[in-house]
Every structure is written in structure tokens, then in C-alpha cells.
């Protein structure tokens, strides 16, 4: 056992002992602030073979990897042999990964398992942080896949969350010992605020002598103000920034990972007292908040990138956000406040969000997607192994063998899998779909377009632009206009300025989604044996990935050039390294004499 220079709390001691003294799977349920992530990293440190630590966000994977190196390893006199894998789901990863501990997202881990890298055979432990996301319509699918893979292969599972509904059901699915505590090392007090009075969940009432936010700034505390949308977050930021200059920041999904990590570090250093945020901060990112104030309890419903209405925050979502308050090492207590207009509303809010149960958990997986992922993972699978895997899911644990056979037959008819009489195997086409992380529904749509007689490239592009994932990433903007502007090399800021709601990070996410879909379609086309068409799609993928026309691709891939300079060189008649070096005077004006010397030596 590693030697530690810190004292563990009783909950951590019990959980670590269970991990070390047995090989059981563990389901750990404990409030935010009890040190679950630190505990899981200690477990990773104690595991001799490979560990995959999965989380909901890339930013969180990067943060945990950083903490593993800079905080956990020094405390236990250990070596942080780890890496964060945060590339896109469709992108390849190293065939021979050296690091022992991998921090990544659920989806990336799922994609990795499908690709049969040699190093995945040595995975001993799978850590699933924020396991409550198994009930999420989008995130839950990957978690269910990961659990099925792990249970089928004897990989140990450690699952954790502060807000687990149906604890016993999840424990049964992963065959886990439950380790539970309700005690927070830092007490969290919940209250409803009406005017200048705080009505606490235990019945106490406190009258505030000054504005609450003003008091927090004066006492140098950090407050998170939760609101429903980015636009509202930025509006509240402007209001508070006028009152408390340079002490306010906003945080939402439109910010890139680097900016999010910078805000976290600057807040820890005391630069900000007020962070206005959307639900982007509900998933484990460890800001030092003393208080969380709910400006709103609604969330927007977005379908195909467009706003369609509102929904109330669920008790799980509320507690995930509320639990950000009161962090060990920063405060001795935490405070969570909901704004209300009158006593009647306050009592209703208390009943809904204070001391409430989380209800039941429902799976949202699609059976044919699960089956294709499973068969692709194993390359070949017999019916009994497939049925055994369904027992370890929320979505299919009680499914009939007849329905599974029916869906397997549909996958066969779609030529995604084949059968040899005793089991099922994945076809080249099916493997291309699974490794591209495509839904079966989308794959069939693309297949129908690709196999048309004399299909034109424009038809394939239209199918990509009409894909649900692309539309969801578009924020309701005109995808055709953005797509054409991007591959022609139009400046990013110019593209964003022409939209209603996009940020630069939104544009980046849309480009990533377009790249993912295009590369996947290229993979499928190649698997179908359509080489000429595949070559065209490979070129289209590169145009989207780099944001330049084909005539500038040779330039943009040169070290140090980048998109903006490649476009400028192209507009000056330079299209490749040979032309760049033969027209040095023009090149020097655009990329500088030093870079010309480096590239042309």
C-alpha cells in the first residue's frame, strides 16, 4: 500500500480498504466534497496494471490528470504514470500506449474499446465517475457499453457519484458492493431567499442586513450564480461586472477547454468572487465556491440546434449544481440558495428540491446500436455472450431473446454483421460504422446515399449537413452557409459575426462534428470498396478539418503555417512548399523571414 502524507477520512478509509482487500466491483455514493475523486486516484495508484478513469467532460479529464501528477502523486510519494486522452471519438489513438492510467470521457473510452488496441487487453480497472449519467439520454449509452464490456471481460468497475438514483439497481447491474455515506466534511445549508430573508430547510429564518452578493464579495468568498442560458449568463455578468469590476467571470459550454481551465485556476488564486454559469459547471469541475445561488430553475430544450421550450431542473441536476458549494480546503461550510417571490412558492421549491429522492433511473440506449458496438468490440460473439451482456445494462436487462434475435437479423440485413451458424461477426462495413462511432440509423442513411447509382459528391455533402448531430451542433444557424464559408477559408471571426448566437468555440464544435461525420462517411465508403469516391471524401475531410480549399492543403499542413497564413499565401499564388521557397520575397512578407529560412533550408 502507498505511503501517504495526509489523513484520510473514515469514508475514504473504508472504501480504500474494500478496494485493497477484495476484487469486488464498488459502487460509491457520497456527497460532493467527500473526496471521491481523490479516493479513485489513490485506487488507480494502487492498481498494478492499466486503469481507465472515465468522466463526462474533456476539461475534467485534463484537470484530473493534472491533479494526479501535481497533487496526488507527491502526497503518496508515487509516480504519476498517466495521460489524458481527449481527442475526437473518430480519431485514432496510439497503438502502443505507455502510460498506465488513462483519463478520458465516456465516449472516448467506448470508442477506444471498439478499436482493439493491444494495450486495452491489459486494462484491470474501469473507473466511472458521475455514474448517475447512465440515465442521461445522450451520455448514458456510452456508459452502458463500457459496463457491458467490463462485465464480459472481468475488468473491475469502480463507479461513483453524489447523486445516484436506484442505487440497488445499478449495484445489481455491475454486481457491486455499495459503499455509502451521507456525511459531508463541509456542511451544506440550503435556503430559499425571499427579499432580504433566507428560509432554511430546517425552519430557521435569517434576515440579511446587506445585499447577499455584496456581502460575499466583501468577505472575499466565491459565489456561483446559476442561470439557464448562455445569453442570460453573459447579461448577468455585465450587470455584476458594473458593480464589482474585475471580480466577475462567466462560464458556459461556449468556452473552449483552455479558457475553462484558466478560469478555474484564476478563481482558485482569488481573482474572481462571482462566477455566472450555466449547467456547464454541474459535472465535477472543482471550483472553490462558498455559495451557489439559483437565478433560475429552468433549462432550455434544444432540438436540432433550435430552442423548442423549457423544462424544470430535476432534483439530480439541482443537487449536482448545489453540491459545488462548500469545498474542502477553502471553506468551513457551504450555502445553496434558491430565489423565490413568496412563501407559497418557497414551500413548493423546498418540497421539490430539498431532501427529495431521485426516483427511478431509465435507460435510453438503442438496441441495434448496442449490439453492433458489442459485436464490433469482440469481432465475433456467440448468442449466449450477447444475452449475458444485455443483463448488465439499464436499457436491456429484461429484454427477451426473441427481440435481440430480431434486431440481430436487422443488422444482418443491413450488412453490418454476418452469421456463421454459431455466432455473429462484424463486417468491414459494420466495423467502419462502429469505429466511426455512428448510430446504426445514421449509417443506413449514409449507406443508402453512397450506394445510389452515379451518386454525386453534393448529395453526400447534403446528407452530412442534414445529419442530426450536425444540426444539433449548429445552434440553429444555416449550416450550408457556415460550411461553405469555412472550407473557402473565411476568417473565423467573420463567420461567427454573421451568426445570431455562435461563439468561436461553437464554430469549433460544429467543425469537429462535420469532421467526425465526414471522416466516418469516408471510412464507410472505403469499406464498401468505392475507392474513387472515398478519395474525394478524404479530400473533403481535410478541407473541413483545416478550413481551407484543396489548393491550400499542402500549405496548411506545413509546421507553423496555420489556416490564416495558408489562405493568404494561396491568394498570392503560392500553393505548396516548392512555390513558397521559390517565391521567397512574397513568402517573407506573409510568414516572416525566419520561418521561410526554417521551411526552405
UniProtKB/Swiss-Prot annotation:
Alphabetized InterPro entries for the sequence: AAA+_ATPase, DEAD/DEAH_box_helicase_dom, Hel308-like_dom4, Hel308_SKI2-like, Helicase_ATP-bd, Helicase_C-like, P-loop_NTPase
Coiled-coil residue windows: none
Entry GO MF terms: ATP binding; ATP hydrolysis activity; helicase activity; nucleic acid binding
Helicase C-terminal domain location: 208-375
SUPFAM superfamilies: P-loop containing nucleoside triphosphate hydrolases (SSF52540), Sec63 N-terminal domain-like (SSF158702)
Keyword Nucleotide-binding: yes
Keyword Lipoprotein included in the entry's annotation: no
Binding site for ATP: 30-37
Enzyme class, UniProt record, top EC level: hydrolase
SMART domains reported in the protein's UniProt record: AAA, DEXDc, HELICc
Keywords per UniProt: ATP-binding, Helicase, Hydrolase, Nucleotide-binding
Top-level lineage group: Viruses
Record motif DEAH box, residues: 129-132
Domain Helicase ATP-binding: 17-182
Pfam families assigned to the protein according to its UniProt record, in alphabetical order: DEAD (PF00270), Helicase_C (PF00271), Helicase_dom4_arc (PF21280)
EC number: 3.6.4.-
Protein name per Swiss-Prot or TrEMBL: Putative helicase 7
Organism: Sulfolobus islandicus filamentous virus (isolate Iceland/Hveragerdi) (SIFV)
Lineage of the organism: Viruses, Adnaviria, Zilligvirae, Taleaviricota, Tokiviricetes
Amino acid at each position: 500500500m502507498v505511503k501517504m502524507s495526509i489523513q484520510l477520512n473514515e469514508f475514504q478509509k473504508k472504501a480504500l480498504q474494500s478496494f485493497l482487500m477484495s476484487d469486488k466491483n464498488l459502487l460509491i455514493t457520497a456527497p460532493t466534497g467527500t473526496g471521491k475523486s481523490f479516493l479513485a486516484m489513490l485506487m488507480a495508484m494502487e492498481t498494478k496494471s492499466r486503469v481507465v478513469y472515465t468522466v463526462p467532460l474533456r476539461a475534467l479529464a485534463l484537470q484530473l490528470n493534472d491533479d494526479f501528477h501535481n497533487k496526488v502523486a507527491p502526497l503518496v510519494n508515487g509516480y504519476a504514470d498517466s495521460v489524458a486522452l481527449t481527442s475526437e471519438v473518430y480519431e485514432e489513438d496510439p497503438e502502443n500506449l505507455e502510460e498506465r492510467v488513462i483519463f478520458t470521457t465516456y465516449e472516448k473510452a467506448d470508442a477506444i474499446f471498439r478499436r482493439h488496441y493491444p494495450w486495452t487487453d491489459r486494462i484491470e480497472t474501469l473507473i466511472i465517475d458521475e455514474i448517475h449519467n447512465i440515465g442521461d439520454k445522450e451520455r448514458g449509452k456510452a456508459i452502458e457499453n463500457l459496463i457491458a464490456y467490463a462485465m464480459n471481460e472481468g475488468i473491475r468497475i469502480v463507479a461513483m457519484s453524489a447523486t445516484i438514483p436506484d442505487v440497488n439497481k445499478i449495484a445489481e447491474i455491475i454486481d457491486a458492493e455499495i459503499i455509502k455515506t451521507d456525511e459531508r466534511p463541509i456542511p451544506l445549508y440550503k435556503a430559499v431567499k425571499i427579499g432580504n430573508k433566507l428560509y432554511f430547510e430546517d425552519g430557521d429564518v435569517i434576515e440579511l442586513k446587506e445585499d447577499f452578493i455584496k456581502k460575499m464579495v466583501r468577505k472575499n468568498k466565491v459565489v456561483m450564480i446559476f442561470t439557464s442560458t448562455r445569453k442570460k449568463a453573459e447579461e448577468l455578468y455585465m450587470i455584476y461586472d458594473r458593480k464589482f469590476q474585475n471580480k466577475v467571470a462567466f462560464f458556459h459550454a461556449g468556452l473552449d477547454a483552455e479558457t475553462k481551465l484558466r478560469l478555474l485556476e484564476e478563481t482558485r488564486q482569488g481573482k474572481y468572487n462571482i462566477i455566472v454559469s450555466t449547467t456547464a459547471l454541474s459535472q465535477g469541475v472543482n471550483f472553490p465556491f462558498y455559495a451557489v445561488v439559483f437565478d433560475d430553475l429552468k433549462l432550455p430544450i434544444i432540438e436540432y440546434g433550435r430552442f423548442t421550450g423549457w423544462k424544470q431542473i430535476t432534483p439530480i441536476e439541482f443537487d449536482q449544481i448545489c453540491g459545488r458549494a462548500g469545498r474542502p480546503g477553502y471553506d468551513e461550510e457551504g450555502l445553496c440558495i434558491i430565489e423565490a417571490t413568496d412563501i407559497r412558492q418557497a414551500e413548493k421549491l423546498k418540497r421539490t428540491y430539498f431532501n427529495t429522492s431521485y426516483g427511478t433511473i431509465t435507460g435510453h440506449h438503442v438496441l441495434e446500436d448496442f449490439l453492433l458496438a458489442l459485436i464490433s468490440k469482440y469481432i465475433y460473439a456467440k448468442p449466449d455472450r450477447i444475452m449475458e451482456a444485455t443483463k448488465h445494462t439499464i436499457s436491456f436487462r429484461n429484454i427477451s431473446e426473441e427481440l435481440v434475435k430480431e434486431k440481430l437479423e436487422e443488422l444482418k440485413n443491413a450488412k453490418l454483421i454476418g452469421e456463421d451458424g454459431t455466432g455473429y461477426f462484424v463486417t468491414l462495413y459494420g466495423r467502419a460504422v462502429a469505429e466511426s462511432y455512428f448510430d446504426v440509423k445514421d449509417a443506413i442513411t449514409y449507406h443508402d446515399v453512397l450506394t445510389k447509382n452515379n451518386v454525386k459528391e453534393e448529395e453526400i455533402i447534403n446528407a452530412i449537413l442534414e445529419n442530426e448531430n450536425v444540426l444539433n451542433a449548429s445552434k440553429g444557424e444555416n449550416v450550408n452557409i457556415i460550411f461553405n464559408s469555412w472550407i473557402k477559408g473565411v476568417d473565423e471571426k467573420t463567420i461567427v459575426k454573421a451568426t445570431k448566437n455562435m461563439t468561436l468555440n461553437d464554430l469549433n464544435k460544429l467543425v469537429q462534428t462535420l469532421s467526425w461525420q465526414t471522416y466516418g462517411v469516408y471510412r464507410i465508403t472505403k469499406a464498401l470498396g468505392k475507392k474513387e469516391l472515398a478519395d474525394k471524401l478524404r479530400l473533403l475531410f481535410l478541407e473541413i478539418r483545416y478550413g481551407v480549399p484543396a489548393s491550400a492543403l499542402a500549405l496548411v499542413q506545413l509546421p507553423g503555417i496555420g489556416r490564416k497564413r495558408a489562405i493568404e499565401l494561396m491568394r498570392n499564388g503560392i500553393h505548396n512548399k516548392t512555390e513558397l521557397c521559390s517565391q521567397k520575397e512574397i513568402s517573407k512578407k506573409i510568414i516572416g523571414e525566419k520561418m521561410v529560412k526554417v521551411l526552405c533550408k
